[in-house]
Each structure stands twice: as structure tokens, then as C-alpha cells.
């Protein structure tokens, strides 16, 4: 009789063209397909980080209900078209970009001037049409965020500092355009009551469908990890008393932090603090790590993400650590 829950062993990714893919996992215990599929779907739609234009300033325009001489579209339609531009920022969370175009012709996303660490995924996206003598000069602020944030929320918060002509946009940050899931039947040997989960996902190109599913799973792991640390049963999954009364640690805690494959900067900062094993690391709190010289918020987030992918978090408690057999460094 098998008492342990089945874990999916077969993973298949089927590319459907464009930025769409189907990710299939099996087998799951009966009911787990819907349990996990619905959770992944909600995270994919609402919690994935992305980038969007949040503020615009257009030369000669005081508000969005305006028109521009020589431009076919009014300002409202220009802003709607601008929301369709897909941005991807590397190593930064916000940037202000410029777009300057004059003379007859199309204005596309490729006309936006970008630094080396800003990428436009759909450069052929049309923003406006200029007629002879037309001119369009605008500044575009792009920020990183999650979900959908109405412009009224930000506009109310910074009303005293709002400059004339600064237009606040509703921002849809999510890189996931559409996601659905189905649960099919799976079979393992004589068991035919198992689930197969198929996630059908389409993104805007800023992230691949596979990476989106992977990132959403990491978010779920990070959010659920805290339940393993409920007061009175800290690390119940990792600390199991042996028959002799000694403490048995999960093998992952005994591995060196080098196996986490952190950046060189983060790894060196940890070693400078005598953090050599994963068990050493998870007992540190965020505040303690931020006090480490040369370890900033970016490195901290990297460490948290790597730990979350393994079902671990910072601030965990380990009794009887380190084990006597652990190598001293």
C-alpha cells in the first residue's frame, strides 16, 4: 500500500506558435490537478511582474483630451496605442524614454529611443500616423509592477507634485495575455483515477510561456513556505527526531551555499559573514543580511528567490544546528 502522494514525473512543453505554449504535467493525485491548476492560473494572471508605460508628456499637449496638428490620431488614441508597446527592462525598475518624429509617415515603437538595457519586444507596433508637417515629441515613463494599476490610484497619491501636461496612464503590467487549464485523466500502472494538468498560456513576449509557469510556481512556493514555520512547529518538515533522540536535518541544509549558484557578489558577501552552508543561510533574517557589507536589496531578492525555489525561506529556526559532523571552515 502506497501512503506517499504521487509527484508529477512527466513534463511536456508544446510550443503552439508565437508566444503561446501548452505545459502538461502528470501524474497528480485525484483532485490535485484542479487545486494546483487554479492556483497557478490566478498567480499567472494577477501576480506576474512586468513593465508598462505609466506616464507620458507630449510637447504642446496639456491633457489627454487634445489633438495635435499634423497627427491623424487624437491624444486618447495615441495613448491607447502606446499601451500596446511591450517593454522589457534589464537591471532597472523604471526608465524615462524619448520619442521624437517629424514628417509624413508612421510612428512605431521602433522610433522610441532606448538605452542598451531597455528592450522593445514589438518594434513594429504602430503608435500614430503623421501627415506632412506633422511632429510628435513625447517623454514616456516605463515602470515595473504587477497586475493592473489604474491611473487614478497614482494620480491621487502624487497630486501636489503633478506637473502640467503630465498624463498618468492606467497600467497593465502583467506579461500574461491569456491562461487556461484543463485536467485530463492519467494512468500509472493499475491506477486510472489520476490527474494530468495541462496549462495553456500566452504571453506578450516579454517572458516565455515556460518561464512564466516556472516563475508563478516559485511565487506560490514562497507564499506557502511560511506555513511550514507555524509557531510551535518550526521546520517540522526538516527537523525529525531520530529514534536515538538526535536531530536529523534535511540533506539540502547540509549542502554548501555554492550549490545555490548565486552571483559571485552575493556568494562572496555570504562567505565574508561565515555563511558556508544552506542551513547557516536560512537562519539569517532579511535585516541581518542587509547589514552585510556590499549586499544590497538586489542580492537579497536573488537569495530569496533561489531559496524559495527549494521550498526554503530566510528567518527559519533550526534546533541543534550545526550538526556535530558538519565540517568546520
From Swiss-Prot:
Domain of life: Bacteria
Membrane-spanning segments: none
A family per Pfam: RNA_pol_L
Annotated catalysed reactions: RNA(n) + a ribonucleoside 5'-triphosphate = RNA(n+1) + diphosphate
EC number: 2.7.7.6
CDD domains per UniProt: RNAP_alpha_NTD
SUPFAM superfamilies: C-terminal domain of RNA polymerase alpha subunit, Insert subdomain of RNA polymerase alpha subunit, RBP11-like subunits of RNA polymerase
Region Alpha C-terminal domain (alpha-CTD): start-end pairs: 249-329
HAMAP family: RNApol_bact_RpoA
Quaternary assembly: Homodimer. The RNAP catalytic core consists of 2 alpha, 1 beta, 1 beta' and 1 omega subunit. When a sigma factor is associated with the core the holoenzyme is formed, which can initiate transcription.
Record function comment: DNA-dependent RNA polymerase catalyzes the transcription of DNA into RNA using the four ribonucleoside triphosphates as substrates.
Family: Belongs to the RNA polymerase alpha chain family.
Entry text on domains: The N-terminal domain is essential for RNAP assembly and basal transcription, whereas the C-terminal domain is involved in interaction with transcriptional regulators and with upstream promoter elements.
Record-given protein name: DNA-directed RNA polymerase subunit alpha
Organism: Albidiferax ferrireducens (strain ATCC BAA-621 / DSM 15236 / T118)
Amino acid at each position: 500500500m502506497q501512503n506517499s502522494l504521487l509527484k508529477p514525473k512527466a513534463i511536456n512543453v508544446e510550443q503552439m506558435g508565437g508566444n503561446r505554449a501548452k505545459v502538461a504535467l502528470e501524474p497528480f493525485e485525484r483532485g490535485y490537478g484542479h487545486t494546483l491548476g487554479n492556483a497557478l492560473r490566478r498567480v499567472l494572471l494577477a501576480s506576474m511582474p512586468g513593465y508598462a508605460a505609466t506616464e507620458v508628456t507630449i510637447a504642446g499637449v496639456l491633457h489627454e483630451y487634445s489633438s495635435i496638428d499634423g497627427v491623424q490620431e487624437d491624444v486618447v488614441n495615441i495613448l491607447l496605442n502606446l499601451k500596446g508597446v511591450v517593454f522589457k527592462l534589464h537591471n532597472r525598475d523604471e526608465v524615462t524614454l524619448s520619442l521624437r518624429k517629424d514628417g509624413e509617415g508612421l510612428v512605431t515603437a521602433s522610433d522610441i529611443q532606448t538605452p542598451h538595457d531597455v528592450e522593445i519586444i514589438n518594434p513594429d507596433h504602430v503608435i500614430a500616423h503623421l501627415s506632412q508637417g506633422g511632429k510628435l515629441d513625447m517623454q514616456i515613463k516605463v515602470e515595473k509592477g504587477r497586475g493592473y494599476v489604474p491611473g487614478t490610484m497614482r494620480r491621487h497619491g502624487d497630486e501636489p507634485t503633478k506637473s502640467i501636461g503630465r498624463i498618468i496612464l492606467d497600467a497593465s503590467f502583467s506579461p500574461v495575455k491569456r491562461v487556461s487549464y484543463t485536467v485530463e485523466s492519467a494512468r500509472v500502472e493499475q491506477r486510472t483515477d489520476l490527474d494530468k494538468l495541462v496549462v495553456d498560456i500566452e504571453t506578450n513576449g516579454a517572458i516565455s510561456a515556460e518561464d512564466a509557469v516556472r516563475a508563478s510556481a516559485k511565487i506560490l512556493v514562497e507564499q506557502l513556505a511560511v506555513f511550514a514555520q507555524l509557531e510551535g512547529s518550526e521546520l517540522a518538515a526538516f527537523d525529525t527526531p531520530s529514534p536515538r533522540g538526535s536531530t536529523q536535518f534535511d540533506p539540502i541544509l547540509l549542502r554548501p551555499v555554492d550549490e545555490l549558484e548565486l552571483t559571485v557578489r552575493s556568494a562572496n558577501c555570504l562567505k565574508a559573514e561565515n555563511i558556508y552552508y544552506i542551513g547557516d543561510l536560512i537562519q539569517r533574517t532579511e535585516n541581518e543580511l542587509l547589514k552585510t557589507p556590499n549586499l544590497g536589496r538586489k542580492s537579497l531578492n536573488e537569495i530569496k528567490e533561489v531559496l524559495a525555489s527549494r521550498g526554503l525561506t530566510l528567518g527559519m529556526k533550526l534546533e541543534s544546528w550545526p550538526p556535530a559532523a558538519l565540517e568546520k571552515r
